[in-house]
């Protein structure tokens, strides 16, 4: 877990941040989830769970709640050096993608939050294991950018992400899925 990023996420006023960006913030209805991925801006080196996924919602008692999960919002070294697509590895472009995901199955194996509508990705195809966020490579479409789990307690991204948003451990993922089912 990136403790500095975790601490910043713990103190952030996401409703204000999202509204200031012109995004929607869901503050009505119970368990109307705001799922927010925060990318570590410290470096562009691959293979660490150094990002966080924040989930904010109103719980069953009407109380605003927040969970913060260790995650990666970027591909692992395996996909960066050997991209699945000839166009290069997909890296989700920051932005709000409302209703772009739904409950489904990740690679047909287990329930996850799966891409349902188009999103934008950068394409990184130089196979150097350093993220390139080049606006000239942006592509929009459905690429299977899912929100899923890594191993039980993974410390390296490796093969867990080819562009997906991946929670580092199973317990956090189970919590996210319980929230998504409410």
Where are these regions (language model features)?
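Cell wall/extracellular polymer interaction/catalysis modules
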Residues: 1-158, 172-181
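Soluble non-cytosolic domains of exported or imported proteins
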Residues: 167-170
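Residues immediately within or flanking Cys/His clusters that coordinate Zn2+
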Residues: 161
